[in-house]
Amino acid sequence: MARKTPIVRYRNIGICAHVDAGKTTTTERVLFYTGLSHKIGEVHDGAATMDWMEQEQERGITITSAATTCFWSGMQQQFPQHRINIIDTPGHVDFTIEVERSLRVLDGAVVVLCGSSGVQPQTETVWRQANKYEVPRLVFVNKMDRAGANFRSVVQQLRDRLGANAVPLHMTIGAEDGFEGVIDLIKMKSIHWNEADMGMTFEYGEVPEDLLEECEEMREYAVEAAAEANDDLMEKYLETGELSEDEIKAGLRARTLANEIVPVLGGSAFKNKGVQAVLDAVVEYLPAPTEVKAIEGTLIDGETVDTRVADDDAPFAALAFKIATDPFVGTLTFFRVYSGRLESGTAVYNSVKQKRERVGRMVQMHSNNREEIKEVLAGDIAAAIGLKDVTTGDTLCAESNKIVLERMEFPEPVISVAVEPRTVPDQEKMAVALAKLAQEDPSFRVATDEETGQTIISGMGELHLDIIVDRMRREFGVDANIGKPQVAYRERITRTCEVEGKFVRQSGGRGQYGHVWIRFEPADDNNAEGLVFENEVVGGAVPKEYIPAVEKGISEQMRNGVLAGYPLLGLKATIYDGSFHDVDSNEMAFKIAASIATKNLAAEGGAVLLEPVMKVEVVTPEENMGDVVGDLNRRRGLIQGMEECISGKVVRAEVPLAEMFGYATDLRSATQGRATFTMEFQQYSEAPKNVADEIMARNGR
């Protein structure tokens, strides 16, 4: 099947931002202007098209990333038709994982900021993630009609707080209630959108006198930024002092794609102003799949690095970036095609699980309406129905050309609660529901506490787990009781040690004999996970066939901890000696011997308890500043800094998660509900001795 849209006219973008900056409203407007939704859905009516889960409509926040395809030909129909695949991502810190995996498969991003709040903590997180994946981006300063909105101040914050080379392409006309429209700095014309037809039409006008001088300065800055793209442009600019409109756009595009500048636009999505210009900017300044670095992967030998370029005739390679359970069709696997083509009904190879799978049907999503398609090509984002064993981050490829694309890294959960079904019939349904939800969301884990037999669920924050429990009730009909939230502590050793583990049972008949010497070393990083295991046994002191059992014994004991029953982080273990018995040695004996050696780490390795520390940011009125800082200090917080912002003072601190339960209520009562806070996981740090002793006593150690 031939392509309807050439790949150079594809744009795969994400719309991401801090919670409440107006991402979903912006996306709704995009769908309206591109002709996909005939009635604009409002977030505060609970009718937004992109927020299709019931919880999202109730809470007015976006939880999952809905993927949508739309088409755009420009505000003045000045472009050939471009195909824009949009992923609307959540801004709440507990769902950072959704943002991370969306950015992983996108070519460009639109970061939405609030005109009055400016750069907020989640904006910094999104920015860091976009830097990590080298995603070119542009910024839309939204909500310019809100009290306290200030375009210039937000541009300055982008430079100061994010270190971004922000290049404004708009200047806003008026602000707050007096917000009228924007000035296009490249054309040096004002744009007023028509309110009668919800901004579908607009008029160009002259730049208001009082803004002329400032706009000329800002335009000069943009032209200089464009001229730095290459020698030809710079030469022309130095000779004539001017560049044509097309040259300015070409220069800005080249530098945006190279992540050297960030174009900034302004408007108000709610008031239907500015979103159309953002769509034009997406076409003009963000990359097509062919303009980004070809994705790298490793061949099946696990070492050779290869690339996949965006070409329909190259071998097929795609990345599954999200699994969703749909009430009507079952499991939907969202995937991004990097190279090649795939027809529905054909087989693909999952190179991570090393399994063949058949793709039943494929659909293109418009929020949660779906259109069935027969074929996907390089650059497409689609969802497949009928893939059984695919999980987030798996690579789908042609069996004749196997490759594993870069895996995604998912954060460790920081908070756990026990869940119990209310009735016996709920028991089985709960197991099925939790398994499906864990398959969808890699930052959510399910485990069984071996001592109590309780089911423990873990996630990235209280809201995250609330929503999981809510979804169990709504989507799977499971009622559950929830325990008190528990902090996910960890353990680690602080020094290198050599430990003996010996397990001997020889009292007539077949005995047990396992004996090992293991050198344990701590990882350099407090937050390193897992076990690095090496075998340095020479001369057959421990036969090769027992070595895997030794590794298994260590890793099982690591899961149960050595101090207070919490998993042991970042450990390097090297078996270098031991002994065996011709008759009595077996795998089980060596596994137990290794487990005994690991248990001895509490004393030998100077094991310590680690607690999750959160990065907390509180925005408070000035008069409550003292109370807020005092309260954070009481919670063992380390104040990192304070600064002014439009709505008062911002206090930044690092606080142990254990001290943050119930903080929202305490902060509300201390400031009469005027302060707000956000927190996200920062790192694991050693817990003070008195805290560690208390936890060990509580766990009966």
UniProtKB/Swiss-Prot annotation:
GO terms for molecular function: GTP binding; GTPase activity; guanosine tetraphosphate binding; translation elongation factor activity. It is found in: Cytoplasm. One of its GO terms (cellular component) is cytoplasm. GO terms for biological process: ribosome disassembly. Its main location: cytoplasm. Gene3D superfamilies: 3.30.230.10, 3.30.70.240, Elongation Factor G (Translational Gtpase), domain 3, P-loop containing nucleotide triphosphate hydrolases, Translation factors. Residues 8-290 form the tr-type G domain. The keyword Signal does not apply. This is Elongation factor G 1. It comes from Saccharophagus degradans (strain 2-40 / ATCC 43961 / DSM 17024).
